[in-house]
Amino acid sequence: MLLVSLLRVAARYWRGQRPYVEDMERIVRYMRRRRERGLSAVPSSLVERMQGLGQSNPNRLVGLQMRKLRRTVEYVYRYVPFYYEAMDAQGVKPTDIRSLADVHKLPITRREQLAENPEAFISRYPGLVATTTAQTGGTTGKPLQVYLTTEELHYYAAGEALTGLMMGWLGPAEIFQTHFTVDEAIESIVLTRAAHKAGTLVLTFGTTGTLDDHVESIFRERHIPGKKPKVSWLMASPSHLWALTRQAEEMGVDFRDSGLQRITTGGAMVSEDLKQRVMETWGIPLIEGYGLTETLTCAAGQCGKSERMHFTDVTGYAEVLDPQTEEPVPPGQPGVLTITTFYPDRELMPLLRYWTDDLVILSPDRTCACGLPTTQILDIVGRADHMVKVGLQAFYPQEIGDSLLAFPELVMPPRFTLRTEQREDAQYAIVDVELSASLSPEESEPLRQRIADGIVLSRYWQVKIGAVKLVVNLRPAGSLEHPFAYKHRHLVLAQRNE
């Protein structure tokens, strides 16, 4: 039966169909039993064959994307009310989509449309039943409600369990400690269910307890039959990860005594300073990824062979568009990431050309040492809807937030405002930032100057020397109205290489 399941999963995968959950879970159980016996999750001979499938030539991948795109367009036109009306309004029929180049004919889906009437995006396909809701964090506006079927949830969890077992970060011997509540985000829901399927012990702290309790749990040695003695995987928000790191340092723990092999952080953007701090303190290099609740089947992650993030081209189609003209921009140039989620990977709420408002840069080169010929993200620049212009110069708050995370005297995650002002001598970018505690004037001025020196403005839109002047003001905690809380739908993993 195992061989039948493997063959059926592979066949349905290349036909553009969603594998049966029963087949995936049968493979998960097989991998779990192998791990329980101290073996690798997959025999080496099978690994080679699976790598051969993943390293398929780009033409085969494009053909698969084309089949899935056509099937998705036909499906949403027939069963999703919003897209039937939107496509008719633009005079577009499913038969007009003959190649990937025709995707520009399809309507762009805005976040505001999804927020205003999410039920209009639910498929009316007979037999589909919404059983689970996932909510976006609300970090970029009103939280969105996203609906899933039980089958979809099992499918995503089984997929994560398969990946985790093959990569070695899930298994019956592992202990997973999470500081997200299980219903706080779709990532938590899926990862927790995946861990259960793989036999991993899950310790759910949420935000309860003290930092001392949280650190003690990470380093405490347990004596549970069949389990590793210490927590092997930690998941927390960036601000909580900062706090855990500081608390562990204050407690004087020896980080070499940690059993951590992997750290996952999400729900907020992660700065280069935090990445470096985690590497230096915990000894675990960070592996980056990107994902949204709205397009949960379509994500991107590093393979470990390069700094780029591979997009999951088999479950969705990524475009990068000019924020003003909505026309495609060439690889290597920043633009707004727009995602189409493929049916049947996303069955209840598939989305066409979802405008993420995230500014990214795609790599002009699809080749990678890992062999995957997929779309690759070079960098996530910022939020298109957060851009602040000073004359002809563009500024992105995310770039300022990257620098502010280096200063422990500030509220974490940083809370700040960015405004512009034209004065007689020059144009000014003025940053007001909240302090975590009050400081004397003697302490404030050196800190203010260090922050001003550390802020990096506009990494990709060059600022001419002297063209824009920067002013930093320190404010009491909680005093700023409508600050940027420096949150972003960005996922970063830290993983120890054996």
Model regions and ranges:
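Conserved S/T- and glycine-rich ATP-binding loop of Class I adenylate-forming
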Residues: 76, 136-139, 176, 234, ...
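AMP-binding/adenylate-forming catalytic core of the ANL superfamily
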Residues: 234, 345-463
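Nucleotide 5′-phosphate-binding alpha/beta core
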Residues: 1-135, 141-155, 162, 166, ...
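AMP-binding/adenylate-forming
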Residues: 150-163, 175-242
